[in-house]
Amino acid sequence: MPFTLGQRWISDTESELGLGTVVAMDARTVTLLFPSTGENRLYARSDSPVTRVMFNPGDTITSHEGWQLHIDEVKEENGLLVYVGTRLDTEETNVTLREVLLDSKLVFSKPQDRLFAGQIDRMDRFALRYRARKFQSEQYRMPYSGLRGQRTNLIPHQLNIAHDVGRRHAPRVLLADEVGLGKTIEAGMILHQQLLSGAAERVLIIVPETLQHQWLVEMLRRFNLRFALFDDERYTEAQHDAYNPFETEQLVICSLDFARRNKQRLEHLCDAEWDLLVVDEAHHLVWSTDAPSREYMAIEQLAERVPGVLLLTATPEQLGMESHFARLRLLDPNRFHDFEQFVEEQKNYRPVADAVAMLLAGNKLSNDELNRLGDLIGEQDIEPLLQAANSDRDDAQAARDELVSMLMDRHGTSRVLFRNTRNGVKGFPKRELHTVKLPLPTQYQTAIKVSGIMGARKSAEDRARDMLYPEQIYQEFEGDTGTWWNFDPRVEWLMGYLTSHRSQKVLVICAKATTALQLEQVLREREGIRAAVFHEGMSIIERDRAAAWFAEEDTGAQVLLCSEIGSEGRNFQFASNLVMFDLPFNPDLLEQRIGRLDRIGQAHDIQIHVPYLEKTAQSVLVRWYHEGLDAFEHTCPTGRAIYDSAYASLINYLAAPEETDGFDDLIKSCREQHEALKAQLEQGRDRLLEIHSNGGEKAQQLAQSIEEQDDDTNLIAFAMNLFDIVGINQDDRGDNLIVLTPSDHMLVPDFPGLPEDGCTITFERDVALSREDAQFITWEHPLIRNGLDLILSGDTGSSTISLLKNKALPVGTLLVELVYVVEAQAPKQLQLNRFLPPTPVRMLLDKNGNNLAAQVEFETFNRQLSAVNRHTGSKLVNAVQQDVHAILQLGETQIEKSARALIDNARREADEKLSGELSRLEALRAVNPNIRDDELAAIDSNRQQVLESLNQAGWRLDALRLIVVTHQ
């Protein structure tokens, strides 16, 4: 190689050294100094792994003093290059810059610069980069983005609500599904969509204290959303890092009590500029016209400041009209400002609901009914639609569906309130109760008697709680030496039940963690029963492992022993046997226990076993729950109301179980109250709202479409390719499970989303649902999204050289494969990727500029090519540099037409879609006041900004591959 002192070269094998300068040479060796690192390298002159750095007219270069030069001309003087051009900071022309004075930290970012500088990537990395571009672009445009990646069953009514609400600007809605229908999952899906699309970045979730960990677990395990839990300690710590502690995290969960308790803390919460606020158990926010509660006022303050609000609440009818109005008032105080007016309005919706019922029944409509429909809809040109709906023509059903849709749009609260009921949703199992009456051991009788004497001053409530758990009373007196499990007949019964049902999975729930731990030891030591334990003292990872062991079919635990708090937020639909070792204090907790198994998607009827001790509070409670509330075999929406009204009497019976006088009357009166309230709820059902919330056929199709996308084999192939190239170890464990672990030779030292000790993954939704320790990999999973970002945000795979063995072409024939990206820059919240995601345009050019890409498909072509090592590649590039420059010029002239077509299509699609949405809502605004002005303004502003951004769209070369034909 011809070396001259002062020339600039770059190392082919150590490009991180930057630009080197020739500082010494003799007949056989050359020495390069790399000023940016201060290191020297000695190379053999004849075959050194270095590439001469030469820039061309049109390039911009940086001097060692930091100023930049746009090159107009390149001269050579005594073997050294001199660049002549315009200095960018002073705009001075004819400025010269000798190559020896170039900035040594020069980074080659353009693919062509990297190629000419000898920074040649492996061929498989180029292929991965192209696939990453192609798949990322496709995924951005796929329908239902944000709904495909969560670890949940594809349940139509949940998907319907999430799809409707998740795409809105700053949604403000009330989610009021009945228990067991998945409000938390619906909220999570909405959050996931909003965060993934960029519509929201900062989210605050406020929940009752007992549900904080449940939400934390659900958001992480189901949606891969890592929330920070703020309590007093965390808040104090964060004060050291920021004036407003809540600005240290993007996603925050805190309790309602924590938010309300301290005035400054509430101010900090209000000032933290959240995009979305989620409030669970919103029915506990007490409001009246004269005296709203402090909790209500705290949430009201936040709701005034946060653009998007999701309130999760029990069914509205359970709580009374005023309570329901109070929640709607939080969502839109301008619209819901007068309670009397609201009550009147609700009455006026009855004809609308009747009209919908009429259409759905499918019967022929009378002239009066047709006229009533016309009046209700109030649209011009509705006559043909009414005639079609009332005919025997093929389009009759479609016309009826359209009329129902038009009525829905005019229905008062359909945009702000969603409520599904078990009556309207199929897929729930039956619940069967099996009570087992057992004698009270003498040891317990003695302990209870002594406790009664010593605790005479205790309140009735405290005595009632004690009487529910006689083993705790006994243990208190006996201390560590007390072995209640040796004589408690419930333990004997449990062991007998488990040994006679060894093939069945059984969930056992008890109130206390200590009880669960003691039972596990007894079952293991006495009968060798495999039992996993699950309690609040365990970390999330430990609970995951316990749940996974329980979920394993053949080698897993037969029984899972849960404490009351430990089981929150976990569902075990694969089991259908529930044993309640004791009973909880109130009907909400009872429903929560049964709800661990009684979820939508449960395949079997649920067998509920309650072994109880006679003459204890358990014997009182089991009768009251079953005979008074029917709470074991059916969900009990009336439970809380009756519990509150019967509380004083019930507590006395629980505190003194032997006093049974009048208990039958209490049960009878509670049952009558239950039946009356239930009938009242049924009568008050809003059928129209249920139809709207349920989604009907549309929701079924949505679930089916996502299920079809689950079968995308491209994902598995791409993910494995990505893991191979990044350097992540993969260990196939069978059962559709793969263990990923970091290796010592990864592309990056710390791959985002991959724990240090690795993780288990699956591509199968069913496996992910039964194995909580396995992460469900989809295109939306952080591992894949981070992998795409890692490849595409850097220069991995952006320049390479390959050989094509093809005797039909002359040896030395050049082809250049160019991958351009057409894109527009815009703030994430505009969601520009719906219309123009970064889109790859592939070209395969010969030296005459003929584009062969349409005839030669990428994957087929890629398989015909072979790799070249970097050193040989650098020599090839130097030999054909001028030809490659010429082909690149031809590519630049051809890309404009393709790019312009893509941009024009995107602009047309965006205008049609956003203008259509705006027109539809503006037309509806006239008949439905629940469409907010700020929502209309946001859509209009969004449309203008999107079109403006698309006008600024451009293109750039993202990757190139030089292909040289050989016959060997």
Curated annotation (Swiss-Prot):
Residues making up the signal peptide according to the UniProt record: none
Name of the protein in question: RNA polymerase-associated protein RapA
Binding site for ATP: 177-184
PANTHER family xrefs: DNA ANNEALING HELICASE AND ENDONUCLEASE ZRANB3 FAMILY MEMBER, SWI_SNF-RELATED MATRIX-ASSOCIATED ACTIN-DEPENDENT REGULATOR OF CHROMATIN SUBFAMILY A-LIKE PROTEIN 1
Domain called Helicase C-terminal: residue spans: 490-685
Highest taxon, organism lineage: Bacteria
Protein source organism: Salmonella paratyphi B (strain ATCC BAA-1250 / SPB7)
Residue ranges annotated for the Helicase ATP-binding domain, each copy included: 164-334
Gene Ontology biological-process annotations: regulation of DNA-templated transcription
Gene: rapA
CDD domains (alphabetical): DEXDc_RapA (cd18011), SF2_C_SNF (cd18793)
Enzyme's top EC category: hydrolase
Record-stated family: Belongs to the SNF2/RAD54 helicase family. RapA subfamily.
Motif stretch (DEAH box): 280-283
Subunit structure: Interacts with the RNAP. Has a higher affinity for the core RNAP than for the holoenzyme. Its ATPase activity is stimulated by binding to RNAP.
